Amino acid sequence: MSTAGGLPRAVERARAAHCDTLQVYTRSSRQWRARPLPDGEIAEFRRLSEELDVRPVIAHASYLINLASPDDTLRRRSGAALGDELDRAETLGLLGVVLHPGSYTTTTEEEGLARKIGRAHV
């Protein structure tokens, strides 16, 4: 559901479309930097989700995240972005976060899985 105009608008759009659950991006899915969530927007989002009975709401993590990348810089950046996604989901009272954990690219599947698992325990 589109979050144009802010996250609370997505809840209103979901209810108008007769949806009783919702998946949103809490930030741009194609940029590393995320705008801060204003307290008023958080409060309105939580209030509308409850009031309009649009629950559960789930976030979808950024497509840039790649916890399996052999590139250390990308992997660190991905870990930080995932942490931010989880923090935003908690702040908004969301049920969870959908994540595509990434691709092992030029290495083996086993090496990529080892990096993902290692990152999950950080």
What are these regions (language model features)?
Residues 1-61, 65, 69-86:
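N-terminal pre-domain/capping segments
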Residues 67-119:
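Active-site acidic/histidine proton-transfer and metal-coordination neighborhood
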